[in-house]
Regions:
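Structural motif detector for alpha-helix initiation sites
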Residues: 108, 149-150, 253
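Short, well-ordered surface patches within globular domains
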Residues: 25-138, 146, 202, 207-226
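Long, non-membrane, amphipathic alpha-helices that form coiled-coils
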Residues: 1-38, 253-292
Length: 292
């Protein structure tokens, strides 16, 4: 009968939705485990096996400084997420630079994110703030006693150093002159009102040979062993000559961020998706009762 058909359809809908809810319950339980794995969980989900080796090599279990997924570690999902906008901010400065016009955006590669993360962890956990040099890549690092935003980070790495670069270039000086000639160094200090004039971070950002980058960020309420609450880093490489990356898995920041957000949002929304579907199941059960 029509009535029986309606009952059967309602029963089928309930059965199907019950399966969905059971799966979502499992997803929710696994989400907490995956969140705790930080960037490792993300790299595993997308099959970035070379990248996982970097985390493994530098993990605390192997005597390194990377405590995978910990809140005050660059591999935590929140710190990873925070670091992504640094790529875009740096690219905007790079591609509009007046000294080297026509530069293209740096692409990204998961392995360079991992290298940036483990190197920044080594920096933050060192006795003093400095480059860890664990891998052969270019690197900019910065530290602050507050939660630094991209503008402030790149103000130090780019804006202030471009002033120095422009000043010495206008006088026909090189960066070696700046380093080795005390009188010239002092002149730049006074002219630009900069305590430590330098150009190395700026020249990394505008280096035409670099093709690919990865970034990392740490903020912890208590200062890290290097004395700073905030540590940030960006590494640079060229996949033609790199020991770590190839064109495979090298992509735009937009493509990478889409992957990251899909993974992150699924984990973070596991709770609400479960409760939405539980509500849907309850209303389907109520419909079934009405049909009987």
């Amino acid at each position: 009968t029509d009535q029986q058909t309606k009952v059967n359809e309602a029963q089928d809908a309930v059965t199907a939705q019950e399966k969905v809810v059971i799966q979502l319950r499992t997803d929710k339980e696994q989400a907490q485990t995956k969140i705790a794995q930080g960037s490792k969980g993300f790299f595993e989900a997308y099959g970035y096996t070379d990248t996982l080796k970097i985390l493994e090599e530098q993990s605390t279990t192997n005597g390194g400084y990377t405590n995978i997924g910990a809140e005050n570690d660059a591999t935590s999902l929140e710190n990873f997420k925070r670091a992504l906008s640094m790529v875009r901010y740096g690219n905007k400065l790079r591609t509009t630079d007046t000294n080297v016009p026509g530069l293209s955006d740096l692409t990204v590669n998961p392995t360079l994110f991992a290298i940036s993360q483990v190197q920044l962890n080594a920096t933050a956990n060192g006795k003093i703030f400095g480059h860890s040099q664990l891998y052969r890549v270019g690197e900019n690092i910065a530290a602050a006693d507050y939660k630094s935003n991209d503008e402030l980070l790149f103000n130090g790495w780019y804006t202030e150093e471009k002033q120095v670069y422009d000043y010495i270039t206008a006088r026909g000086w090189t960066k070696d002159d700046l380093k080795n000639d005390a009188a010239k160094y002092k002149e730049v200090q006074q002219a630009l009102n900069q305590k430590y004039p330098q150009v190395g971070h700026y020249t990394n950002i505008i280096n035409k040979d670099y093709t690919t980058t990865g970034t990392a960020y740490i903020y912890s309420k208590d200062p890290a062993p290097d004395g700073w609450e905030c540590n940030a880093g960006q590494v640079f490489d060229f996949f033609q000559y790199s020991s770590y990356i190839t064109a495979t898995n090298t992509m735009t920041i937009d493509e990478f961020e889409a992957q990251f957000n899909e993974y992150y949002n699924k984990l973070m929304n596991a709770d609400s998706v479960l409760s939405e579907n539980q509500t849907k199941l309850d209303s389907l059960k109520a419909d079934l009762e009405k049909q009987k």
